[in-house]
Each structure stands twice: as structure tokens, then as C-alpha cells.
Swiss-Prot record:
The lineage of its organism: Eukaryota, Fungi, Dikarya, Basidiomycota, Agaricomycotina. This is Ligninase B. Residues 1-21 form the signal peptide. It holds the Pfam family Peroxidase_ext. Coiled coil: none annotated. SUPFAM superfamilies: Heme-dependent peroxidases (SSF48113). Disulfide bonds join C31-C43, C42-C313, C62-C148, C277-C345. Pathway: Secondary metabolite metabolism; lignin degradation. The active site is at H75. Belongs to the peroxidase family. Ligninase subfamily.
């Protein structure tokens, strides 16, 4: 059974289980901290949680270390190719932690440039707590997202055996790849379609770039990089006017706001006829954003794994805070209006949004992790 079909079956089973929860007495285990979990083996992850919140995420912040931890999940997980396996070649193990186990090899791959810093920061926690790299990467990514206001309640499953060999190069999409290349890549990895590709890119709502422009680091993709919201989907549809740094870098196109970066792949996917309407659908629709990203994140973290053999430890992941009440879910940054939108969806009009008051928005850089 293909991964996507298996994952759908697991999701259905979980939904049916939740629907009947009132009629079933759920067995819960009580941990030493007084919290309860569905499986006693999950209790150990509370110690990991406390440690990384304090010593990796600086008290639970949605900062550079959180952003890079989320990026690491995708780069570890997407490195799997059933098409290569069908040709008799090793196609990678997906969400197996190979990028940390074989970091000297995989972080040297071009799309993984810069990830060596977060791998270096995370490795001591793996060694200290005796967990597998694949499980830790998924856990740290889920916790990182929970630190970002507006994020969904993240799921986390354990049960990943350590990788035995590095993933092959060429499996992680690049900013300069075409839409066709990226759609084909995610379809090969997990039978994901073009709509689910857009869901994956929701992670760019809480992200920054350190390595596209060598002259400047910590450039966010939108004006609210510390909040999991739909501003990324608004601002990628605004007309680009300038580069935040040197310009002319491979995979970079003009962005609409000073201090904000736009990569070529986001620009083209936002305007492609196959993806433009799904892209626009997230504007001012926080509930859709949350639901779709919750699904796709779990699917990514189970690539290459058997979900039936994994243990659900989602109880350990904190719940994120709501989006600050002084901000609408979506808006035009100060100085921008509907006239700046390059709408590509032919099916529905662009949502009506307010423009924030004040001078033109300038986006602040995010300090990169130590050593970056």
C-alpha cells in the first residue's frame, strides 16, 4: 500500500477513534510531572521538552533556532525517492534522521547549506537524552512550531530506527527549481499533489533565509515571521519592487518590502495556474491554514516510516498561543493596497483586506543561530 493511502487510513482510524472517545474509557499513563499521556513511553519526552525549550529555544521563542528546526524537518523528511528504489538504487529513508547522522555528507548538499548550524546545536540533546535523531528532529520541529502563535496543535509520533546510510543528493527542492520540478519531487516523495505542496510551504510563514544572499542573513519571508499566520500568502502575491540585499542571487526575485526576501520558487508557485487558487485560499483563512498544515506536517514526518508501528506522543507537544488580538489574520502591510496584488487565481477575487496604518513597512532581520 502506498504511503499516502496508508496515512489516509491511519488518519481515518484516528478520527473514528476520537469520535467514539466519549463511549470508550481511555487508558492513560501518569508521568512523574503529573501530566498524563496515552502511552507511558512518552513520559521521557517531557524531559526533552523542558531541556530544549530552555536551552535551544531560549524559553520557548519562535526565533532563529525554531525556524531552522522547522526547516530541518522538511529537509530530512523529503529526502526519499520511491522512483529511485524502483530503479534498484537507494532512494533515501525519509524522516529517519540521516541528515544528522551523516551530517558531514548531507549538510554539504547545496539545498542543505546552513543546516549544519542547527544540526550542531541539536546533536547534544540527542546524545544527552538517548533518543534517535529522526525522532528528535520531528519532535524539535513540532515544539518549535508550538512556540509560534497561531500554529496548529502539532502531532508527534516516535518509533523511527536510525538511518544506516545517507540520503542521496538531489532530493531536496531548490529555490531556483521550476514548479514542474518541485511538484514532481514531492509527488515522488509521498504522492503529494500540487495542493499539498502549497500546504507544505505554509512553513515559510515562520521562516527566514541565511544563505540565498551571502551579504545579509536572517531575512524573513513575510512581515510577521514570529507568527504562524497567512501573511506569507498575502505578501508573496504583492508586486516585487527591490532586493533586500545585493540582488542577482540564484533563486531570488524582487520582494515587496524592505528587509523581506522572496525566493523564486515561492514566487512562481504563487502564480502558477495549478497552485495559485490554493495559495490565495489561505489569505484571511486561519482555520484552513491550521488544519492543512497540521495534516501535512504529520505526513512529512512519517515519510519512509510505518505509521502502524509508531507511538503517538502528541500529548507532549505544547499548544501554541493565539495570534495577538491587535492583528487581523491577514492584512496589507503599511503602504500596500489591492493595487499592489499580482493576482493569479482566475476563479475567485482576492479577499478584501485592510491596510495597516503608518509609514511603509520595513521588515526586521532575525539574528541567525550562533555560529551561522
Amino acid at each position: 500500500m502506498a504511503f499516502k493511502q496508508l496515512f489516509a487510513a491511519i488518519s481515518l482510524a484516528l478520527s473514528l477513534s476520537a469520535a467514539n472517545a466519549a463511549a470508550v474509557i481511555e487508558k492513560r499513563a501518569t508521568c512523574s510531572n503529573g501530566k498524563t499521556v496515552g502511552d507511558a513511553s512518552c513520559c521521557a519526552w517531557f524531559d526533552v521538552l523542558d531541556d530544549i525549550q530552555q536551552n535551544l529555544f531560549h524559553g520557548g521563542q519562535c526565533g532563529a533556532e525554531a525556524h531552522e528546526s522547522i526547516r530541518l524537518v522538511f529537509h530530512d523528511s523529503i529526502a526519499i525517492s520511491p522512483a529511485m528504489e524502483a530503479q534498484g538504487k537507494f532512494g533515501g529513508g525519509g524522516a529517519d534522521g540521516s541528515i544528522m547522522i551523516f551530517d558531514d555528507i548531507e549538510t554539504a548538499f547545496h539545498p542543505n547549506i546552513g543546516l549544519d548550524e542547527i544540526v550542531k546545536l541539536q546533536k547534544p540533546f540527542v546524545q544527552k537524552h538517548g533518543v534517535t535523531p529522526g525522532a528528535f528532529i520531528a519532535f524539535a520541529g513540532a515544539v518549535a512550531l508550538s512556540n509560534c502563535p497561531g500554529a496548529p496543535q502539532m502531532n508527534f509520533f516516535t518509533g523511527r530506527a536510525p538511518a544506516t546510510q545517507p540520503a542521496p543528493d538531489g532530493l531536496v527542492p531548490e529555490p531556483f527549481h521550476t514548479v514542474d520540478q518541485i511538484i514532481n519531487r514531492v509527488n515522488d516523495a509521498g504522492e503529494f499533489d500540487e495542493l499539498e505542496l502549497v500546504w507544505m510551504l505554509s512553513a515559510h510563514s515562520v521562516a527566514a533565509v541565511n544563505d540565498v544572499d551571502p551579504t545579509v542573513q536572517g531575512l524573513p519571508f513575510d512581515s510577521t515571521p514570529g507568527i504562524f499566520d497567512s501573511q506569507f500568502f498575502v505578501e508573496t502575491q504583492l508586486r516585487g519592487t527591490a532586493f533586500p540585499g545585493s540582488g542577482g542571487n540564484q533563486g531570488e526575485v524582487e520582494s515587496p518590502l524592505p528587509g523581506e526576501i522572496r525566493i523564486q520558487s515561492d514566487h512562481t508557485i504563487a502564480r502558477d495556474s495549478r497552485t495559485a487558487c490554493e495559495w490565495q485560499s489561505f489569505v484571511n483563512n486561519q482555520s484552513k491554514l491550521v488544519d492543512d498544515f497540521q495534516f501535512i506536517f504529520l505526513a512529512l514526518t512519517q515519510l519512509g516510516q510505518d505509521p502502524n508501528a509508531m507511538t503517538d506522543c502528541s500529548d507532549v507537544i505544547p499548544q501554541s498561543k493565539p495570534i495577538p488580538g491587535n492583528l487581523p489574520f491577514s492584512f496589507f502591510p503599511a503602504g500596500k493596497t489591492i493595487k499592489d496584488v499580482e493576482q493569479a487565481c482566475a476563479e475567485t477575487p482576492f479577499p478584501t483586506l485592510t491596510t495597516l496604518p503608518g509609514p511603509e513597512t520595513s521588515v526586521q532581520r532575525i539574528p541567525p543561530p550562533p555560529g551561522a
